[in-house]
Amino acid sequence: MKITKIEKKKRLYLIELDNDDSLYVTEDTIVRFMLSKDKVLDNDQLEDMKHFAQLSYGKNLALYFLSFQQRSNKQVADYLRKHEIEEHIIPDIITQLQEEQWIDDTKLADTYIRQNQLNGDKGPQVLKQKLLQKGIASHDIDPILSQTDFSQLAQKVSQKLFDKYQEKLPPKALKDKITQALLTKGFSYDLAKRSLNHLNFDQDNQEIEDLLDKELDKQYRKLSRKYDGYTLKQKLYQALYRKGYNSDDINCKLRNYL
């Protein structure tokens, strides 16, 4: 087969053959196989050229994808599939990128966890799930997590939550709120509980009473649209008790309120 035309098309070159076949190749392919118009190729040379062209094009795509941020092996492989790189070529591209240190799942996991320590608010369980979703294996994640101390981060997150809700909730409800939030963010129950030790949950009686008054007004506006009489009183009691207020304080308020 003879090359009848070589035409540059943006990042690729269009190669046309005298058997009406055509294909796109990278500049690396042109150089490697010394392609030029009227060059004759046998079947083996053509197949080698096609394989290398796919490999070269796929690698260029991967490098473009990696230019924005670190990616896992799986993320790069999925990106190549999306751009229709042949499946049997993808492992070769991944291997080359690993050898040239463009991708490294262990390093990615380490960077992700360290960045979270500096600027994030996630505990180890959520971090592991997010890294698993990126296709990083547990054996690359677990050693890094086990060597990372999350106690300071848990304290920072708990302090932020404390500052946010301190003037809105009574002590018991505030503790429960912070604990549940930390669990949701992936911290262990033990770490969530220990992070509360540096917080001051003391509130004087007047502060608690003011909070109770505000919450009672809020719940009354909401529940009085549907209920009245004894049922309304029951619903108000239940709502306030769930918020963490003392049973005696609630009953006292309800007697004077209704």
From Swiss-Prot:
GO CC terms, sorted: cytoplasm
Pfam families according to UniProt: RecX_HTH1, RecX_HTH2, RecX_HTH3
Database matches in InterPro entries: RecX_HTH_1st, RecX_HTH_2nd, RecX_HTH_3rd, Regulatory_RecX, WH-like_DNA-bd_sf
Record's keyword annotation contains Ion transport: no
One GO BP: regulation of DNA repair
Main location group: cytoplasm
UniProt keywords, alphabetically: Cytoplasm
UniProt keyword Transmembrane, yes or no: no
Location in or out of the cell: Cytoplasm
NCBIfam families named in the record: PRK14135.1 (NF010733)
UniProt similarity note: Belongs to the RecX family.
Function, in words: Modulates RecA activity.
HAMAP family xref list: RecX
Protein name per Swiss-Prot or TrEMBL: Regulatory protein RecX
